[in-house]
Amino acid sequence: MPSNRVLLTSLALTMLACTSEETATEPSSDGTSALVAAAAYTAVDLGTLGGGSAIARGINPAGQVVGESFLEGTSSFHAFLWEKGVMTDLGTLPLGQFSGARGINPAGRVVGFSHGGPFAVVWDDGVLTELSTEAAFPSVANAINPSGQVVGSFGSGLREHAFLWDKGVLTDLGSLGGDQVNSVATAINPAGQVVGSSNTLSGERHAVLWSKGVITNLGTLGGDRSHATGISPAGQVVGSSLTASGEIHAFLWSNGVMTDLGTQGGPLSVATGINAAGQVVGYTGPDVLEGEEPPVGQRAFVWHKGVMTVLGTLGGSYSRAFGINSAGEIVGTSLTAGGETHAALWTRK
């Protein structure tokens, strides 16, 4: 694994209900995962907006799901809201060709991006509004908390910075190297704590936590790169990091300690979200990152209290999880038996 692999999620879309008995695992001494038990989850196909590929990114306590999907007969993809079996196209900014939804809060407000830069946007009761960031720089909104605070990144080329948007005011969160290096914010909890990653002046990329105006370097699992993707109400942080041996492993950071969550079915694991109960979701298996297709053999997982449970698919050869709500409902994407990638929902039986 090259040590310079960037862990940041790109803007590119990576892209039958079924029930299966899955395998639960716990990390062993060598960082991999050992078989310990079996658990049953139901995988539900949420479909697409007519095209052959869709991915679910987030789910709120009410079970509303957001993500993006290709449209029928076009190369365009649009943000969607799925609720009670119905997937709704959220549209784009005027003249826009694509949009994507990255997060949804308990009130149903959705954030993401839309073509035209792209630019960070928020959907409120179906009304799409562009967030005011800085000049005409591209931007993307990655998460929104119950208070309506939004985080993401803005900028292009040599300068990309994390931002916090609150009640119409945008704050540049800075980086580990001031204005000279890049940063991105990916998640925010109810307390307003923000996580993401930042370059350092020495050229490394580290997971970071912003809390009360202070940025904290969360370190790595021994390599030179890490990236945080989720934070719980209690301040537990999840993400992925290069290890000393050059593999990418999921981590859980709590009270100053970063723990390797191990892998299953291959050398790779990536954590993408965490809920209030400390349940962590992501994907594990062969060494293929998001945007690199096809990730044959990868499986979505949920990790809790040292146990990694590998989830099933919609009949195809891979699945990935990207979000989890307080009820433990998990969303992501999976290959179907028909060879399409559909948005997916996993629930515990």
What is the predicted function of each stretch?
Residues 20-349:
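Residue-level hotspots at or immediately adjacent to binding/recognition sites across diverse folds
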